[in-house]
Amino acid sequence: MELLLKYFPTLTPTQVAQYTQAVSLYEEWNARINVISRKDMEHFVLHHLLHSLGIAKIHPFSVGLKVLDVGTGGGFPGIPLAILYPEVSFHLVDSIGKKIKVVQEVATALGLTNVTSEQARVETLEGQYDYIVSRAVTQMADFYKLTKHLLKPVTNKGDKRGILYLKGGDLTEELAAFPSATVYNLSEVFEEDFFETKKVVVL
């Protein structure tokens, strides 16, 4: 867990234990249900835990928020963020049942009472959330169209709502229709080569 503590030095002993246990749990589940490429498991902390936590470096969450993770797969970025923010509610959604089973089992094993999960397609979802997070599920235009109805309306001047999207590569063309989008380079936050082209899009 040295890599996580390098960037998140205030992690509690409980959080360090949860992240450590998460590595073992995903190794165990991945041997049974392939939710992460086998080769990628060798870099699990870097490629999945720390990458997910890039959102927290760019846009920290405050207590009491509701966050929706769309297309969570095996639980990313939702599970790592839920460990970091135990007082924020996370709802993790994926259309593939076996992946949601892994999410449920991992969340239960880690004692994450702030995590709920559901097998569903995003267009069938109801409810309202402060933030929607995701990791490169589809093009931003399609993602926004499918999820915008799930964001809580802004009722007070100080309210903050939005989409926090982990993406990579050149996003100039993809984001041309979203002049209000802000792109943050994770290479400015994390020094590892893996993050050279990784970004967080805030919309």
Language-model features: locations:
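Conserved SAM/SAH cofactor-binding pocket of Class I
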Residues: 53-134, 144
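Conserved hydrophobic residues forming the short capping helix/wall of the S-adenosyl-L-methionine
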Residues: 30, 106-107, 151
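N-terminal auxiliary segments of SAM/dcSAM-dependent transferases
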Residues: 1-38
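Conserved alpha-helix/loop element of class I SAM-dependent methyltransferases that forms part
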Residues: 28, 32, 45-63
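Non-DNA-binding regulatory cores of transcription-related proteins
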Residues: 120, 147, 166-169
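Active-site capping/gating segments
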Residues: 169-203
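A short, conserved alpha-helix within the catalytic core of class I
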Residues: 140-150
